[in-house]
Amino acid sequence: MKTTVTTETITDVKMNIEPEETPTLDDKVTPKGKGKLDMVIAFDTTGSMAAYIDDVRHQVAEMIPRIFKDNEDLRLGIVAFGDYCDMENRDSFGNAYQCIPLTDNENDIIKFVEESKDTSGGDGDEFYELVLKKIIEESPWREDSSKAILLIADADPHEIGYTYRDYVVGNQIDWRIEAKKAADMKIKVDTVSICGRSWCKELSAMTNGISVPFKSSGKTGTMIETATTARSAMAFAESASGCEDASTRAYCRERVHGLKGKLFSMFSDCNDEELNDVCDSYTKEIDKADE
């Protein structure tokens, strides 16, 4: 029996055919193990840093999803810290060291930051030396990941011999030794120096990290997003440089360029000299990693 196809039938068939969509970068699946980044953000919660941390708390709910969208194999850890004087006693840190270990659970990170407690800090110096030691030794770093720490600081670490009550007697932790330990583990320590501390520059130099001066408390969230976006770009650049598969290498380079594009769009209309300096510092490092 012959079937007659009418104009109406053809129209109906055309209407039921879905056009094929060209996959975008966001639709593509990241090749396994490429762009893998473990990054710990550590911020000083003492009184002088209150405005900086408040800015992060206000932005974190919107910022964290954007950061994780940039990299499907990202894990973040957060450390909020004070000083020895903020400990409950010699055996309990209390609010002096608050930590969420490396994780990809966005809700847990947001909740932790929003609920983190402020501290006093007491004297001028803070226990940055202990913070570095604990992050380096206790974080569950993945063996094949790019590793970074972002330390936001406005004071100096305690030197050898420092004593506070019986909480720490004759401090034996040297931040320089901790920096060498980080370098040996290929952990890059980026520092945001609120008061232009020279030790921050030295710490970053020792670990092949980036050190940027920063004064404006209302832009701390933007600075953190810039740093994490850039570190994701560098992780993809590292994956590309060590990859023999041409298609995977091309994908990683495409991700690098996409993340650089995000940074450019973030700062294309920015007239803030301080933020532009942060962006320029990180962009230069991305270019070096992508050579």
Question: Where do the model's predicted regions map?
Answer:
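Divalent cation-coordinating acidic motifs and surrounding scaffolds
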Residues: 2-291
